[in-house]
């Protein structure tokens, strides 16, 4: 049996699977989990794939991209996603996490897929809310948006950031869909003086790119090497990965030269 991942409308990958382990459907989401000989379990969420053996790549990169460029990481907001492994990584800092996800049925269906599901959900500093309005009014050091936000969402979320806060959002991969990345950079650039694209180096099973945005904090100039060296139990993230994430080939430097703000 095979499952297909759509990388772009014109590019697809196929993966061999042995069996379907789970099929859960809610009003807005479809989650299927498969067993694979080469990749362990594979979750397909709305046609996007998550590989259980490689969950740590994105969660470590996004968590420590924010955590190692901020002196303090006290308040974190995660919206528009299901990745509890991201919260697990963020708990390496002395932080409180607000996790906004309305679809409890799908979230709870990841119980055997996310290795630290129970540990995160039971952490006293973790708050799961169905919507932003359910949270106390506060300012955040780091906001992670796990789907590409429109300008209205950007406008609302940036008002929730502290003056030196960091906003990280998912975007299209700059190499595969550079026009979409340009548009995402432009949207964020209307609100932030620092907007820089990045990817996960050596991650070959993803079609994602990301954008680091801030009013004051710079992802390279403000990188704190001692914080990176102090991290324990990480398998992917280090200083080399952090810096390489922002490297662009010559042609993309030219493409994005009017959109990157640093």
UniProtKB/Swiss-Prot annotation:
InterPro entries: PABS, SAM-dependent_MTases_sf, Spermi_synthase, Spermidine_synt_N, Spermidine_synt_N_sf. It is an enzyme of class 2 (transferase). The lineage of its organism: Bacteria, Pseudomonadati, Campylobacterota, Epsilonproteobacteria, Campylobacterales. Its EC number is 2.5.1.16. Belongs to the spermidine/spermine synthase family. Spermidine binds at residue 83. This is Polyamine aminopropyltransferase. It catalyses: S-adenosyl 3-(methylsulfanyl)propylamine + putrescine = S-methyl-5'-thioadenosine + spermidine + H(+). It is found in: Cytoplasm. It comes from Helicobacter pylori (strain J99 / ATCC 700824). The keyword Cytoplasm applies.
């Amino acid at each position: 049996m095979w499952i297909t991942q759509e990388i772009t409308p014109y590019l697809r990958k196929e993966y061999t699977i042995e069996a379907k382990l789970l099929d859960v459907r809610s009003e807005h989401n479809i989650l299927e989990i498969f067993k694979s000989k080469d990749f362990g379990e594979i979750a397909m969420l709305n046609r996007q794939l998550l590989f259980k053996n490689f969950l740590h790549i994105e969660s470590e990169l996004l968590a420590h991209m924010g955590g190692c460029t901020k002196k303090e990481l006290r308040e974190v907001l995660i919206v528009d996603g299901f990745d509890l492994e991201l919260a697990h990584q963020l708990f390496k800092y002395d932080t409180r996490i607000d996790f906004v996800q309305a679809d409890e049925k799908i979230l709870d269906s990841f119980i055997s897929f996310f290795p630290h599901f129970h540990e995160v959900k039971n952490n006293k500093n973790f708050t799961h809310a169905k919507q932003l309005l359910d949270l106390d009014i506060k300012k955040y050091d780091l906001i992670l948006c796990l789907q590409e936000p429109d300008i209205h969402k950007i406008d609302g979320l940036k008002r929730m950031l502290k003056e030196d806060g960091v906003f990280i959002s998912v975007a299209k991969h700059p190499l595969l869909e550079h026009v979409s990345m340009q548009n995402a950079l432009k949207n964020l650039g209307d609100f932030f003086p620092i907007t820089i694209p990045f990817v996960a180096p050596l991650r070959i099973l993803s079609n994602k790119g990301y954008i680091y945005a801030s009013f004051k904090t710079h992802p390279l100039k403000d990188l704190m090497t001692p914080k990176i060296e102090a991290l324990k139990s990480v398998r992917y993230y280090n200083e080399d990965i952090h810096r390489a994430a922002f490297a662009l080939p010559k042609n993309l430097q030219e493409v994005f030269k009017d959109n990157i703000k640093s």
